[in-house]
């Protein structure tokens, strides 16, 4: 996929939603995957997987609050319906190895449901710049 094709698909900006308390760490170290945050703080990523509540990890670059994984846990009894291999823990570990971006700004109602738990920030990132950095990955 070319840079232009990527921008045509996702638009000129992509968005990342994060608790406002994460902004200090993002400024200090950039966006990192939850599993990497766990490793940097000396935890095994499996220790933070399948979180029932938001979990804050503290490393040298500052705190990072990870969202809960209640949607996964709510579907636990039906995991075989959506997992073709592995366990729910395996899936949670895969999700924690990723950073999620949205191709368009979320509806206000979606952001409000997140903010009901904790104040959030919506980060806007240049899609072309993101492609330039990660196209080879």
Regions found by a protein language model. Give the residues of each.
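ADP-ribosyltransferase catalytic core
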Residues: 52-137
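ADP-ribose/NAD+-binding catalytic cleft of ART/PARP-like enzymes
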Residues: 1-90
């Amino acid at each position: 996929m070319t840079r232009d094709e990527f921008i045509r698909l996702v638009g000129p900006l992509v968005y990342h939603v994060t608790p406002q308390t994460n902004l200090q760490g993002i400024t200090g170290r950039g966006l990192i995957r939850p599993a990497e945050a766990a490793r940097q703080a000396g935890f095994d990523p499996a220790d933070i997987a399948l979180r029932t509540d938001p979990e804050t990890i503290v490393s040298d670059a500052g705190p990072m609050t990870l969202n809960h994984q209640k949607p996964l846990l709510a579907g636990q009894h039906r995991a075989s319906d959506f997992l073709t291999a592995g366990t729910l823990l395996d899936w949670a570990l895969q999700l924690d190895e990723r950073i999620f971006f949205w191709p368009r700004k979320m509806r206000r109602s979606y952001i409000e449901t997140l903010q009901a738990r904790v104040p959030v920030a919506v980060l806007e990132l240049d899609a072309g710049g993101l492609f330039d950095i990660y196209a080879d990955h």
